[in-house]
């Protein structure tokens, strides 16, 4: 009991702390465009910048557009909710202005806590609300199968959102969960891998219970919402909330998915490696979470009606006594379809293990709901207090650290739920374990530590969700007690086996039992008359088959055969190869742990059958009693009792200590379970790193193997090349040896030919370069021509546009002139009309005056007429009176009338009154006159009337004309104004057009100036290029001429070489004969030496004898020289045969000079032309011919015929015998093909003798084209140069004895490119050569160009056609002598490309040389 009391207190404290963690509703009502709050009400724009107090509010800047979806009603009508891009939140109404209204009729509904979630920028993972889902499914099962589709279709239509929604939401949640699991690895904190598992729970708990500063006014509402107060609502209210939360949830889920994408982008930026490392595992686990997250969001329906703080709160919180919430939960249970849809979408990454566990657990909990058992909450509370909350506190602390470090990603919308927070935590813990089970499938070697805790905690927590909700199930759903116990036992056992044995273990049969038992239970319960059971079957029975069969299919391949027997079998086709080994290890380990902890699960099964309702009543009754006692004890001094809740303090302390140690134990176990998984992240990282390194290593090895193969191939090729090169070298050496044996001089000639060939190649390469330059220049010229054409076309276009503008200008000018003319005409017409109007005004005024006068005259005439009428009347009256008088007087009528008339006339006239009779007559006469005058007056009156009528008509006409003129004037004025406006417009247009024209003209002028400058630059470049082209063409022509000359010279040298070869063959024969003679002489000398030695010994003996006895031997002295000996005369005065055989004539001094073979007199060695017989008979300075020199017995044979190499010859000829000079007359016959020069100039093919070249007889058929081409060029000067020179004796005289030839350099350097065909070497007086010691050993600088006639060599790269004269023209040596080439140093003074100009020496003294 002490333990129970301690648990009661701790449970109460925890429930109170959870009560205080509720969120605040900003308003109770809201207005939306539709029931789901997904319709866009209006679009607004921000009038000012706004920053909200927390993350529930939307931050924006001025001018941004916001889409409004929700408007709060009631107290906070000033707040609207909308989205800006991917951000969603509340903002004040006065900060925005409406731009466009989409929905005018708004729907008012109640708000939920999920509308005011605040995520604070951290990743929020929607966990699976298994506790309430499983606990309440018992109420939400439809009893009839025919209602199943109808009811489920309602919710399917609510949740079948666009396909892109689940794709984004699924990927977002997958990737959001991965970094949540991986966050500690990247944070780098000391508890790196410890936090790895704990961050998930913390992020879930932190999101569900955000740390919001709740004012006291919101505490009660928070308590209501957390404890589910007001659970006993009427069915109408529940049905109202059926549709609203569903639609709200779809909208909120869409918003949360958008928020998750923002967090995902941050995640991808911050933790790309860890996300990649655990992507597959996190996606496997994220599917059930995604399902429950969508479901849990719609479950958070606020219940504003409350029935008391403790009673309703704890009944809703703890899950008993609330029997009217079944209809409310229809809306909450409408989200399980969402649990299936993401499953079906993310099928390729989802494992069967968690699905199976969830399904079996759900079936078991449904069955347990239908069982009216009495499980005790002791073990449940013990588990919460010992494991979940201790671990939660620890995780909360760690997560706060992670939040401070910014390492953990959380979403910005924590879901508030009316479920129990402890249940949520336990569900989260279950999800953590599932996640760990799925993520940690690969590394299994170190998971033995968690084998004790994971099965225990899993089974304990899976079955723990039910006892809180046992009382929610109506009594008619309860099954018979024995059947229920059996089913639950089977389900628990089978659940464990299905949970921990997945693969080929013997537990496959038990896994089949899991499905069979769970489905049998679910089918059994589905027949009970509850409204949502079929709903659960619609979405949970297919979730085991459809999610795994049709969509997910991710589980182990070996599970298939065991599940084929069932129609709802789980297939796995996508991740077979990936998960077989890991699932085998996991199932084996879990199977062992299951066997070890079987007894614990039996105890747990018993503990879960204890009545929670009675125990909770017993738990809360002491609390009530305690409050009553405290109230009663307050007036008495507030002394504590001797016991606590009716228990002794000893028991209470013991229970507290035991509970404390139990908490520590479970914390320790949880810590060990967490620590047991620390290696997972590291191992995955290391595995990824290792795999990457292995891949890199394999790539590097492949590259290395390829490079090694290439290197080996290259080595093989190089070895082959080296072998071939060695072979060629050996062959060349052998050939050289043979050639040396045969004739060393041929190799020298071939070397000279090679030099010439190289020079020819260089010339040809230069020629090709020049051709390339020409081609480039032509291309450039072409491109420049194209550019010039394009520029010309552009200029033409510009000119055309300019002309068009000019034409337009002329047209505009003409139009302006026409408009001005029209304007002037209109002005003139206006003036005329104004003048006419003035004239008409004057006429009208005159007519008005006339009218006035006529009216006055008319009035006067009318007065006169009136007067006359009155007078006539009076006259008639008087006449009548007169008639009356006549009747009275009795007189005649006529007399009376006459009398009357007369009287009247008299009375009128006042003349005849005194005579009455005459007056009567006069009166009558006067009356007749009056009648006549009256008639005339009447005629005048009629005329006046006619005139007046005419005047009236004219007046009317004039008035009409005036009116017409006025209208015409008005119209003309309007036209005038119109024309004036048009004139102004035209003037404005003219100004604008002139400005535009000027601007265009300026632009065109600028363009033209730029183009002109560009054209000038191009022309300058073209001129420069033309000059370069002209220079290049000139150089090309010179090169061609020189190439032709070289070809001709080459041909001539070839012909000369052929003649020299013949002569050398003859020389070789002569040298052989001389060698034989020398050998005979040598033998003679040896014999003579032997004889002399013998004589010497004899004389020494005689001398000794004579010393002993002077008179002992008296022998006559014979001739010591033995001239008459059989061996012939002694040649002691001559050089030894070795030296004598290779001594060269004095012309050897001229050897290093090696003048051109084209020199007169055989080119220094003889005539170049082999067909000239006179060249073979050239005499030396003593007049000896070459034929005579062949028979000279005292002269050593020529070195050119010797079989020894030339450097041997030179070395042996360096020191002649003492007192012995080179006899000029004893030179061997001269072959006219050998020549040599030390001048450094190109003086014939003899310059190339130091290079190895095949003999000329071999080259006849395979001669290079360069040599063949140069052969023709060398033929030109043969006729002029093969003439014997008369200056040879003097020149040869200058080359007298006393000169010692220098040692020969083994390799000749690059030759100074000089054309040797020029005749300038034949001119000039003979002069003595320099001293012998420095002539051949010195470099070419020894003879500076200024010391000798001829221009100095100029260092430019072009070869001249004529040879330069940078060195003295040494005279040709005596015929038959072929000196060795000089040192390479003397040859390499100038590069081969530098040619001193020698145009002057070519024509300086040719005739005197020929004459001499």
Curated annotation (Swiss-Prot):
Regions annotated as coiled coil: 725-850, 948-1102
Ranges where the SH3 domain occurs: 39-101
Membrane-related topology note: Single-pass membrane protein
Biased composition, class Gly residues, residue ranges: 1160-1169
Ranges of the Lumenal topological domain: 20-605, 627-646
Region called Proline-rich domain (PRD), residue ranges: 1259-1412
Gene Ontology CC terms: endoplasmic reticulum; endoplasmic reticulum exit site; endoplasmic reticulum membrane; membrane
Superkingdom: Eukaryota
The keyword Glycoprotein appears for this protein: yes
Cross-referenced SUPFAM superfamilies: SH3-domain (SSF50044)
Location of region: Disordered: 260-308, 401-424, 540-562, 1153-1304, 1316-1412
Tissue-level expression: Highly expressed in liver and weakly in testis. Expression was higher in patients with severe fibrosis or inflammation and chronic hepatitis. Isoform 1 is specifically expressed in lung, testis, small intestine, colon, pancreas, kidney, liver and prostate. Isoform 8 is expressed only in testis (at the protein level). Isoform 8 (at protein level) and isoform 9 are expressed in cutaneous T-cell lymphoma (CTCL) cell lines, colorectal carcinomas, breast carcinomas and melanoma. Isoform 9, but not isoform 5A, is expressed in head and neck squamous cell carcinoma.
Intramembrane segments as residue ranges: 606-626
Glycosylation sites: 59, 368
Signal peptide region: 1-19
Transmembrane segment boundaries: 647-667
Comp. bias intervals (Pro residues): 1346-1355, 1365-1383
Region listing for Mediates interaction with MIA3, in residue ranges: 669-1258
Compositionally skewed regions (Basic and acidic residues) per UniProt: 540-552, 1178-1197, 1268-1278, 1402-1412
Keywords of the record: Coiled coil, Endoplasmic reticulum, Glycoprotein, Membrane, SH3 domain, Signal, Transmembrane, Transmembrane helix
Gene Ontology terms describing biological process: endoplasmic reticulum to Golgi vesicle-mediated transport; lipoprotein transport; protein exit from endoplasmic reticulum; protein localization to endoplasmic reticulum exit site; protein secretion; vesicle cargo loading
GO MF annotations in UniProt: cargo receptor activity; enzyme activator activity
Main location: endoplasmic reticulum
Domain notes: The proline-rich domain (PRD) contains repeated PPP motifs. A single PPP motif is necessary and sufficient to mediate interaction with the COPII coat subunits SEC23A and SEC23B. The coiled coil domains mediate interaction with MIA3. The first coiled coil domain mediates interaction with PREB.
Name under which the protein is recorded: Melanoma inhibitory activity protein 2
Gene designation per UniProt: MIA2
């Amino acid at each position: 009991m002490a333990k129970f009391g301690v648990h009661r207190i701790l449970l109460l404290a925890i429930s109170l702390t959870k009560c205080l963690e509720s969120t605040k509703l900003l308003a109770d009502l809201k207005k939306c465009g539709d029931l789901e709050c997904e319709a866009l009400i209006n679009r607004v724009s921000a009038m000012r910048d706004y920053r909200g107090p927390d993350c529930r509010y939307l931050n924006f800047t001025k001018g941004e557009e916001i889409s409004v979806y929700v408007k709060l009603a009631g107290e906070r009508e000033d707040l609207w909710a909308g989205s800006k891009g991917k951000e969603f939140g509340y903002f004040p109404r006065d900060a925005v202005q409406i731009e466009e209204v989409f929905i005018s009729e708004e729907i008012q509904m109640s708000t939920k806590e999920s509308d005011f979630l605040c995520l604070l920028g951290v990743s929020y993972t929607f966990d699976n609300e298994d506790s309430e889902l499983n606990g309440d499914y018992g109420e939400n099962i439809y009893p009839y199968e025919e209602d199943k589709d109808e009811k489920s279709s309602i919710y399917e239509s609510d949740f079948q959102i666009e396909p892109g929604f689940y794709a984004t939401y699924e990927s977002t949640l997958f990737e959001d969960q991965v970094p949540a699991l991986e966050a500690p690895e990247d944070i780098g904190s000391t508890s790196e891998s410890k936090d790895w598992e704990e961050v998930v729970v913390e992020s879930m708990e932190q999101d569900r219970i955000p740390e919001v500063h709740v004012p006291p006014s919101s505490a009660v509402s928070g308590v209501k919402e957390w404890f589910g107060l007001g659970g006993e609502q009427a069915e109408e209210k529940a049905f109202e909330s059926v549709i609203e939360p569903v639609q709200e949830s779809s909208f909120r889920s869409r918003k949360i998915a958008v928020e998750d994408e923002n967090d995902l982008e941050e995640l991808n930026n911050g933790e790309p490696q860890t996300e990649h490392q655990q992507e597959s595992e996190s996606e496997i686990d994220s599917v059930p979470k995604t399902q429950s997250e969508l479901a849990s969001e719609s479950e958070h329906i606020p219940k504003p009606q409350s029935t008391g703080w403790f009673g309703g709160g704890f009944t809703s919180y703890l899950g008993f006594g609330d029997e009217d919430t079944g209809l409310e939960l229809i809306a909450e249970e409408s989200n399980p379809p969402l649990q299936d849809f993401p499953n079906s979408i993310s099928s390729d990454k989802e494992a069967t293990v968690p699905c199976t566990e969830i399904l079996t657990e759900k079936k078991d909990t449904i069955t347990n709901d239908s069982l009216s058992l009495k499980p005790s909450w002791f073990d449940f509370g013990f588990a919460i207090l010992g494991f979940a909350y201790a671990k939660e506190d620890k995780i909360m602390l760690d997560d706060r650290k992670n939040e401070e470090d910014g390492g953990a990603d959380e979403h910005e919308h924590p879901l508030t739920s009316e479920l129990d927070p402890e249940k949520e935590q336990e569900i989260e813990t279950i999800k953590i374990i599932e996640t760990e089970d799925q993520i940690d499938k690969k590394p299994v070697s170190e998971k033995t530590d968690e084998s004790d805790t994971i099965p225990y905690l899993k089974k304990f927590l899976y079955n723990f969700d039910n006892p809180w909700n046992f009382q929610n199930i109506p009594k008619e759903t309860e099954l018979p007690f024995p059947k229920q116990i059996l089913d639950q036992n089977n389900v628990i056992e089978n659940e464990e086996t299905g949970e921990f044995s997945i693969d080929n273990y013997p537990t496959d049969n038990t896994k089949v039992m899991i499905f069979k038992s769970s489905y049998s239970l679910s089918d059994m319960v589905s027949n009970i008359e509850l409204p949502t059971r079929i709903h659960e079957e619609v979405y949970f029975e297919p979730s085991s088959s459809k999610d795994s069969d049709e969509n997910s299919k991710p589980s182990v391949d070996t599970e298939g055969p065991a599940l084929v027997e069932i129609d709802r079998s789980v297939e796995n086709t996508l991740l077979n190869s990936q998960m077989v080994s890991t699932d085998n290890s996991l199932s084996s380990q879990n199977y062992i742990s299951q066997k070890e902890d079987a007894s614990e699960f039996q105890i747990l099964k018993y503990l879960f059958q204890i009545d929670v309702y009675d125990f909770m009543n017993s738990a809360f009754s002491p609390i009530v009693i305690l409050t009553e006692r405290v109230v009663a004890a307050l007036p008495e001094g507030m002394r504590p009792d001797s016991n606590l809740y009716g228990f002794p303090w000893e028991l209470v302390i013991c229970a507290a200590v035991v509970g404390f140690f139990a908490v520590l134990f479970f914390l320790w176990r949880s810590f060990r379970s967490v620590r047991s998984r620390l290696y997972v992240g590291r191992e995955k990282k290391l595995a990824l790193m290792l795999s990457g390194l292995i891949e890199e290593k394999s790539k590097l090895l492949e590259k290395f193997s390829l490079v090694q193969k290439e290197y080996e191939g290259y080595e093989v090729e190089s070895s082959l090349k080296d072998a071939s090169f060695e072979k060629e070298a050996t062959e060349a050496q052998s050939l050289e040896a043979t050639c040396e044996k045969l004739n060393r001089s041929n190799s020298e000639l071939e070397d000279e030919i090679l030099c010439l060939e190289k020079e020819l190649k260089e010339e040809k390469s230069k020629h090709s370069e020049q051709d390339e330059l020409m081609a480039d220049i032509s291309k450039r010229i072409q491109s420049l021509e194209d550019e010039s054409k394009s520029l010309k076309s552009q200029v033409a276009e510009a000119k055309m546009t300019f002309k068009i503008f000019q034409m337009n200008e002329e047209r505009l000018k003409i139009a302006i002139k026409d408009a001005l003319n029209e304007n002037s005409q209109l002005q003139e017409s206006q003036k005329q009309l104004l003048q006419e109007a003035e004239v008409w005004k004057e006429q009208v005024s005159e007519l008005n005056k006339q009218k006035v006068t006529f009216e006055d005259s008319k009035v006067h005439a009318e007065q006169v007429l009136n007067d006359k009428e009155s007078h006539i009347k009076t006259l008639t009256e008087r006449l009548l009176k007169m008639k009356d008088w006549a009747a009275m007087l009795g007189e005649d009528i006529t007399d009376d009338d006459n009398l009357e008339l007369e009287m009247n006339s008299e009375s009128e006239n006042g003349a005849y009154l005194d005579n009455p009779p005459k007056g009567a007559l006069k009166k009558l006469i006067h009356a007749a006159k009056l009648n006549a005058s009256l008639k005339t007056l009447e005629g005048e009156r009629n005329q006046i009337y006619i005139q007046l009528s005419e005047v009236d008509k004219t007046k009317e006409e004039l008035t009409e004309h005036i009116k017409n003129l006025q209208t015409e004037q008005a119209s003309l004025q309007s036209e005038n104004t119109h024309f004036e406006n048009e004139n102004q417009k035209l003037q404005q247009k003219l100004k604008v057009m002139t400005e535009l024209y000027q601007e265009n003209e300026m632009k065109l002028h600028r363009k033209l100036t730029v183009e002109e400058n560009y054209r000038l630059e191009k022309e300058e470049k073209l001129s420069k290029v033309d000059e370069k082209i002209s220079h290049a063409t000139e150089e090309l022509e010179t090169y061609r001429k020189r190439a032709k000359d070289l070809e001709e010279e080459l041909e001539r040298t070839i012909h000369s070489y052929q003649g020299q070869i013949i002569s050398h063959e003859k020389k070789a024969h002569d040298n052989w004969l001389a060698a034989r003679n020398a050998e005979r002489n040598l033998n003679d000398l040896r014999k003579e030496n032997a004889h002399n030695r013998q004589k010497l010994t004899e004389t020494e003996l005689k001398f000794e004898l004579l010393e002993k006895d002077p008179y002992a031997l008296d022998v006559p002295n014979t001739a010591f020289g033995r001239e008459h000996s059989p061996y012939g005369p002694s040649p002691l005065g001559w050089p030894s045969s070795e030296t004598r055989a290779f001594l060269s004539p004095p012309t050897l001094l001229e050897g290093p000079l090696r003048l051109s073979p084209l020199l007169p007199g055989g080119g220094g060695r003889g005539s170049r032309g082999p067909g000239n017989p006179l060249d073979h008979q050239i005499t030396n300075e003593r007049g000896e011919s070459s034929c005579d020199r062949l028979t000279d017995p005292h002269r050593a044979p020529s070195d050119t015929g010797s079989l020894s190499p030339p450097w041997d010859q030179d070395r042996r000829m360096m020191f002649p015998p003492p007192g012995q000079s080179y006899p000029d007359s004893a030179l061997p016959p001269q072959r006219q093909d050998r020549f040599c020069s030390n001048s450094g100039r190109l003086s014939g093919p003899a310059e190339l003798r130091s290079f190895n070249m095949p003999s000329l007889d071999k080259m006849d058929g395979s001669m290079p084209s360069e040599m063949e081409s140069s052969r023709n060029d060398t033929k030109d000067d043969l006729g002029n140069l093969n003439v014997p020179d008369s200056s040879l004796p003097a020149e040869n005289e200058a080359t007298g004895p006393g000169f010692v030839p220098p040692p020969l350099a083994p390799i000749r350097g690059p030759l100074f490119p000089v054309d040797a065909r020029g005749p300038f070497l034949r001119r000039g007086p003979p002069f003595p050569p320099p001293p012998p010691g420095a002539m051949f050993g010195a470099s070419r600088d020894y003879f500076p160009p200024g010391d000798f006639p001829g221009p100095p060599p100029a260092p430019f790269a072009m070869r001249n056609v004529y040879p330069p004269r940078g060195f003295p023209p040494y005279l040709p040596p005596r015929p038959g002598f072929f000196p060795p080439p000089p040192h390479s140093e003397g040859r390499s003074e100038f590069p081969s490309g530098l040619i001193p100009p020698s145009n002057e020496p070519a024509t300086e003294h040719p005739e005197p040389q020929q004459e001499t």
